[in-house]
UniProtKB/Swiss-Prot annotation:
Keywords: Lipoyl. The glycine cleavage system is composed of four proteins: P, T, L and H. This is Glycine cleavage system H protein. Residues 24-106 form the Lipoyl-binding domain. The keyword Acetylation does not apply. It holds the Pfam family GCV_H. The keyword Mitochondrion does not apply. GO terms for biological process: glycine decarboxylation via glycine cleavage system.
Length: 124
């Protein structure tokens, strides 16, 4: 069974979002997603200050099995990227909710996310 954290919200495309309560958010891929993809070998991160429109791909995670896009859950601006993934993309496999986060962003509104109960149902 995949780990799901109850302090986050989730997207249909298996990303997690942590709301810091000040208009900033941290985002990564879920445990379910990293398990399906397998061992990570490369992460293509966006640039700081990039502005991304809702549902646009802005990041790519590559594993030994496949490459997968990461999509914006809202109109957002990148404020920080996890540079540790440049040297250790496998952090996503070992610690997808903590050390393996992808980006931090700011946004005026992040809607249409699933809470832990709803996300758990789509995994069943």
């Amino acid at each position: 069974m995949s780990e799901i954290r109850d302090d986050r919200q989730y997207t249909q495309t298996h990303e997690w979002i942590l709301d810091h309560g000040d208009g900033t958010y941290t985002m990564g891929i879920t445990d379910h997603a990293q398990a399906l993809l397998g061992d990570m070998v490369f992460v293509e991160l966006p640039n700081i200050d990039d502005e991304v429109s809702i549902e646009d791909e802005f990041c790519v995670v590559e594993s030994v099995k496949a490459a997968s896009g990461v999509y914006a859950p809202a109109d957002l601006q990148i404020i920080k990227v996890n540079k540790a993934l440049d040297d250790e993309p496998e952090l996503i496999n070992y610690s997808c909710y903590d050390d393996g986060w992808l980006v931090k962003f700011k946004s005026h509104s992040v809607d249409d996310l699933m809470n832990v109960a709803v996300y758990a149902q789509i995994l069943d």
